[in-house]
């Protein structure tokens, strides 16, 4: 292939777009197709083929193209031109669609030429135009349209000033109309057809591709041949059906009762699959005994062409057996009921298409092909012992190893001997507990007396001191729940049996009782009133947190809150809380002493 690289180089070569369109090397866009000048490109290809192009440099041979390259460029020009034509057709179609849509829009604005005919005339403007001429109907809303308009007065000055002709023709004045008179238009001069040289543009013709031919249209003769073949098939089918009918009539009636369901099934299938022509042929083939048709009437009613073609072979003539004559039939006193004609029977490959009733019941009785439903038994309710529940607090894997080890250590069941203590030991322990309770009560009474004396000496001191906080913390530590089960604690108490600590001798004003506050059950409303009075003397707003520190026990807080409710019910104090979980303010009531 002889060519120079600069000829087929993309974006620079003169044949680059045509070469790509011919070889389909890459996809071209619409802009590249429209940039090609088809006429100029064809001339350049012709110059290259005829070796008319000058060499790029003097002394070199003239550029030439091979036959293959020339053919490819010609194909590329055709494809580019075809694509340009297709773009043009699409643009025209797009423009026509826009014009059609614009015409379909409803015009809601009236044209200016139609406005004067639909609106009432402006009488004021007419008077100004006519130099304030009096208008008799000025101010009237409805005017008879047949009245003349001042603008329609004929102007005859130019007729009077013109030369008098020999014979004056009578001119009829035009009828007066409310619309302004339009000026006369000069008729356009119509030219002869010979002078007109404008010709219609030739339509774009598509190139005919060789080897592409349409299928020939079916002729009338081919249709007649197809109809004749179908008629032959129908006749053959009818003959087979007649043979089957004769065989069934010859067979005993028991066989008919067995084959009756099969025939009914065949009738339903034939009615949906077979064409309507066989039913008509059957009606002609088996006429009633009291009807007699001439032989020329016994034709197959159907589509009959108006004019038969000579070159078409006519179909075979239907030869049906002649109906039996009435004279040969023996007279019968009563005509038997007419049997229903059997439809076409379907032929199956298997002799037995379905299982018989006996075999079906036999298979059901054996139970080989069916099984009973298994009876679902409810799961037995498993009762777990307390020991198992203690050993497994949750499902496996849900509890961390540290908590599980702690649970298993504390969930050990003590031995039976430790759980069943003798009755004597229980009585002794009960007596010891009573004695310890009495001693504790005596201590608290002594402490309360000492506290009253100290309050009398130091009235400005707060209700709760740091020693009380430390003792409360000690009480909380004592009241913490132990992870050791009670059975083991009982065993350890019996083994150790610690001696109760000896109480020291208290002087008149000991310092130790200040570290042991009175119990919650010994608090009274008078103590709460004294604490509120102390807060007021210190110019502080009393609230619940000033009476009960945050580290106090729950029992003490509940006791103080109960006493506040009692005092507020007696209208000695007023308790106020502005928002939930907010400060509980304490104010003096009307009955405060």
UniProtKB/Swiss-Prot annotation:
Residues 255-265, 432-444 have a biased composition (Basic and acidic residues). GO terms for cellular component: condensed chromosome; condensed chromosome, centromeric region; condensed nuclear chromosome; kinetochore; lateral element; male germ cell nucleus; meiotic cohesin complex; nucleus. The keyword Disulfide bond does not apply. It is found in: Nucleus; Chromosome; Chromosome, Centromere. Belongs to the rad21 family. Interacts (phosphorylated and unphosphorylated form) with SMC3. Interacts with SYCP3. Interacts (phosphorylated and unphosphorylated form) with SMC1B. Does not interact with SMC1A. Interacts with RAD51. Forms a complex with EWSR1, PRDM9, SYCP3 and SYCP1; complex formation is dependent of phosphorylated form of REC8 and requires PRDM9 bound to hotspot DNA; EWSR1 joins PRDM9 with the chromosomal axis through REC8. Keywords: Centromere, Chromosome, Chromosome partition, Meiosis, Nucleus, Phosphoprotein. This is Meiotic recombination protein REC8 homolog. The gene is Rec8. Required during meiosis for separation of sister chromatids and homologous chromosomes. Proteolytic cleavage of REC8 on chromosome arms by separin during anaphase I allows for homologous chromosome separation in meiosis I and cleavage of REC8 on centromeres during anaphase II allows for sister chromatid separation in meiosis II. Disulfide bonds: none annotated. It comes from Rattus norvegicus. The modification Phosphothreonine is found at residue 164. Pfam families: Rad21_Rec8, Rad21_Rec8_N. The modification Phosphoserine is found at residues 149, 192. CDD domains: Rad21_Rec8_M_Rec8. GO terms for molecular function: chromatin binding. The keyword Membrane does not apply.
């Amino acid at each position: 292939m002889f060519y120079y690289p600069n000829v087929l180089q993309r974006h620079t070569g003169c044949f680059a777009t045509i070469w790509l369109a011919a070889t389909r090397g890459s996809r071209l866009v619409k802009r590249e197709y429209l940039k090609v000048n088809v006429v100029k490109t064809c001339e350049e290809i012709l110059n290259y083929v005829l070796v008319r192009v000058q060499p790029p440099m003097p002394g070199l041979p003239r550029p030439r193209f091979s036959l293959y390259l020339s053919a490819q460029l010609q194909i590329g020009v055709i494809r580019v031109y075809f694509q340009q034509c297709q773009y043009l057709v699409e643009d025209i179609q797009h423009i026509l669609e826009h014009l059609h849509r614009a015409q379909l829009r409803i015009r809601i604005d009236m044209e200016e030429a139609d406005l004067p005919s639909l609106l009432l005339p402006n009488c004021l403007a007419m008077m100004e135009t006519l130099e304030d001429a009096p208008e008799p109907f000025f101010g009237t809303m409805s005017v008879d349209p047949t009245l003349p308009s001042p603008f329609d007065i004929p102007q005859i000055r130019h007729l009077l000033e013109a030369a008098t002709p020999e014979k004056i023709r009578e001119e009829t004045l035009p009828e007066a109309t409310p619309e302004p008179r339009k000026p006369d238009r000069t008729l356009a001069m119509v030219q002869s057809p010979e002078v007109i040289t404008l010709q219609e543009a030739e339509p774009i013709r598509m190139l005919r591709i060789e080897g592409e031919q349409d299928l020939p249209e079916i002729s009338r003769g081919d249709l007649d041949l197809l109809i004749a073949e179908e008629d032959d098939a129908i006749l053959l089918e009818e003959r087979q059906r007649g043979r089957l009918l004769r065989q069934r009539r010859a067979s005993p009636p028991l066989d008919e009762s067995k084959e009756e369901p099969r025939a009914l099934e065949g009738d339903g299938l034939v009615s949906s699959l077979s064409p309507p022509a066989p039913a008509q042929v059957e009606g002609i083939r088996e006429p009633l005994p009291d009807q007699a048709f001439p032989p020329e009437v016994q034709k197959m009613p159907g589509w009959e062409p108006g004019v038969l073609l000579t070159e078409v072979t006519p179909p075979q003539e239907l030869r049906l057996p002649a109906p039996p004559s009435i004279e040969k039939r023996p007279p019968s006193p009563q005509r038997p009921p007419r049997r229903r004609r059997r439809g076409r029977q379907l032929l199956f490959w298997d002799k037995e298409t379905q299982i018989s009733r006996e075999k079906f019941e036999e298979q059901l009785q054996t139970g080989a092909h069916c099984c009973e439903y298994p009876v679902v038994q409810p799961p037995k309710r498993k009762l777990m012992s307390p020991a198992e529940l203690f050993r497994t607090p949750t499902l496996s894997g849900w509890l961390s190893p540290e908590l599980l080890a702690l649970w298993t250590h504390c969930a050990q069941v003590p031995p039976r001997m430790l759980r069943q203590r003798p009755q004597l030991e229980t009585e002794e322990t009960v007596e010891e507990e009573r004695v310890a309770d009495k001693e504790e009560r005596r201590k608290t009474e002594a402490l309360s007396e000492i506290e009253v004396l100290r309050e009398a000496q130091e009235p400005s001191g707060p209700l709760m001191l740091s020693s009380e906080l430390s003792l409360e913390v000690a009480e909380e530590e004592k009241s913490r729940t132990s992870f050791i089960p009670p059975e083991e604690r009982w065993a350890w108490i019996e083994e150790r049996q610690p001696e109760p600590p000896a109480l020291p001798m208290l002087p008149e004003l000991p310092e130790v009782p200040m570290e042991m506050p009175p119990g919650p059950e010994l608090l009274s409303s008078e103590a709460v009133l004294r604490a509120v009075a102390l807060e007021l003397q210190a110019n502080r707003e009393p609230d619940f947190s000033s009476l009960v520190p945050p580290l106090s026990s729950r029992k003490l807080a509940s006791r103080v809150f109960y006493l506040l409710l009692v005092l507020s019910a007696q209208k000695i104090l007023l308790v106020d809380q502005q928002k939930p979980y907010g400060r509980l303010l304490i104010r003096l009531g009307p009955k405060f002493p």
